[in-house]
Amino acid sequence: MCPSIETLSGSPFVETIRIEKGRIHNLPYHNARMNRTRRELFGAREEIDLAGYIHPGPHQERTKCRVEYTREVLQVEYVPYRMRPVHSLRLVTCDEIDYSYKSTDRQCLNDLFAQRGGHDDILIIRDGLLTDTSICNVALWNGTSWITPARPLLCGTMRAYLLDKGLVQAGDIPVEDLPKYTRIRLFNALIGFGEIDEITRIYAVSYTHLRA
C-alpha cells in the first residue's frame, strides 16, 4: 500500500541535486520545491536557501548532493554519480500511488520497480495515463514536439526547467496513445535531457511500441 501524505510527513523529505565542475545545477528550482513542501506540510513560512548548506567546490565529477529535510535541513551528503543505462521499460499500473512530495519513503515506488522483470526500469500508469519511471520524468516525441505528462507522479526540477525554457510541452498521454510516439527521453536532476535517449521497447501485455 502506498503511504498517505499524513504518513509521509513523518519521514524526511529530500532534494537530490547535481553538482559538476564545482557548480550547483538548477538550485532555484530545488529551493522552490523544498520550500513549497516545508510550507504545505510543516507550515514553515520562512524560506531556506540551500546555497548556504551546499559546498560544491571540491566536486568536479558529476556528484549527487542529497539534502534531507523536514521543517529544517537535517543533513547534506555527497555521492559520486554513475548513470544507469536504460534500454527497456515495463509498463506497470498503480492508480493509488501518490508521490507528489519527494519523500525518503519510496516503498511504493520500490514495490512497483520490483515488477520490472528482466527490463531496466518501469513506466508507471495512473488512471490510464503515463506518469514517470521509478526515478525519472519522461518526455515523448510526437514528430514535432516533446510531450511530458501533465500529471506526473513528481514535478521534477529538470522538468520544471525544460517547461520554462519551452523545450518540452505538458500534455496528457493515455497509454493507448503510445503508438503515436516514436521516441522517449528520461531525465531528472542528475540526468540531462537527451542523455537517456536509446530506449527501444516498452513492454506490457499488449504494448511493444516505440523505436529508437
Question: Where are the regions that the model predicts?
Answer:
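Short beta-strand/strand-turn micro-motif
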Residues: 131-137
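A cytosolic small-molecule/anion-sensing beta-strand core signal
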Residues: 126, 134, 142
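Conserved small/polar residues in nucleotide/adenosyl-binding loops
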Residues: 208-212
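A short acidic/small-residue loop/turn micro-motif
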Residues: 138-139, 154
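Conserved alpha/beta cores of soluble small-molecule-handling proteins
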Residues: 1-129, 145, 151-206
